[in-house]
Amino acid sequence: MLYSLARPMLFSLAPERAHELTLSMLDKAHKLGIMRQTVEAKPTTCMGIEFPNPVGLAAGLDKNGAHIDALAGLGFGFIEIGTITPHPQSGNPKPRLFRIPEAKAIINRMGFNNDGVDKLIENVKASKFRGILGINIGKNADTPVEKAVDDYLICLEKVYNYASYITVNISSPNTKNLRSLQSGDALTELLQALKARQLELAEQYNHYVPLVLKVAPDLTAEDVEFISAQLLDFKIDGLIVTNTTLSREGVENLPYGNESGGLSGAPVFEKSTECLRLFAQTLKGQISLIGVGGILSGEQAAAKQQAGATLVQIYSGLIYTGPTLVKQCVEAMT
């Protein structure tokens, strides 16, 4: 109700300013104790972790982990922060975020703008949140793709003790050549290095933190087969399906519809759900799947579950539907 009143004002602002203002308002409401949404418990086990409910916040909303406590008050079963990189970076030039309300869509070309992994860890330490926290890691824009493994290893080592699970983001379309890591020897070398280090860290800290890969929806059936085989070979714990799409289907004739970047929101739902279904058919339950992409209703969350997801994540849907979407999704899922 409150969000439906605030939305016209927020939508009158530039998208990035509205994003900042929303998080600021959420923080203030949390401190005053007036922003707390009660969501039914629906315990769900995934990757050896018991989640209080299967609906999480996707990475990208809270890149630096600066708003964890306020976001936790919305009733999420888990929160994923990031994408974080070894060093701070400003991302791509503005404007870089575009709303397409006619299609309930967003295009972003943010470019992993973040304050660096050390700042994120400071924020996590300062948080009172003791729930399930995913940390999404990436590479700096000025790191050559041939050296990308080094950036992921730095982040893995630094966040290991602060994360419930760690997501390896190789699917953002907004960092040059990043998606090339989804194929061939590049993927093999990355997963091999990360898995070896994960096992060393698990032994060192006597605590196993699951490793999750996040992929794009713009994959062929052959890509799905190859990625699935690699995930199984290296015993990766989970897969997030999917990131944003490069397709412009459904928005090509709308204002901002042909801006460069990744498209999210309603138009990506079918594409990402089909990709999820393909991975589910290929992996046959051997790896946990997390469905994300275009969820704007409880029914769509349930559809992701039917396509093979154990958990779901939302982000763009929150912008168009508001925080009640969390509750709707939890209620619709089994």
From Swiss-Prot:
Positions annotated to bind FMN: A59, G60, L61, D62, K63, T83, N136, N169, K214, T242, G265, G294, Y315, S316
Active site (record annotation): S172 (nucleophile)
Keyword DNA repair among UniProt keywords: no
Enzyme type, top EC level: oxidoreductase
One Pfam match: DHO_dh
One GO process term, biological-process aspect: 'de novo' UMP biosynthetic process
MF annotations from Gene Ontology: dihydroorotate dehydrogenase (quinone) activity
Pathway entry: Pyrimidine metabolism; UMP biosynthesis via de novo pathway; orotate from (S)-dihydroorotate (quinone route): step 1/1
Stretches assigned to coiled coil: none
NCBIfam families, A to Z: PRK05286.1-1, PRK05286.1-2, PRK05286.1-4, PRK05286.2-5, pyrD_sub2
Similarity section: Belongs to the dihydroorotate dehydrogenase family. Type 2 subfamily.
Record protein name field: Dihydroorotate dehydrogenase (quinone)
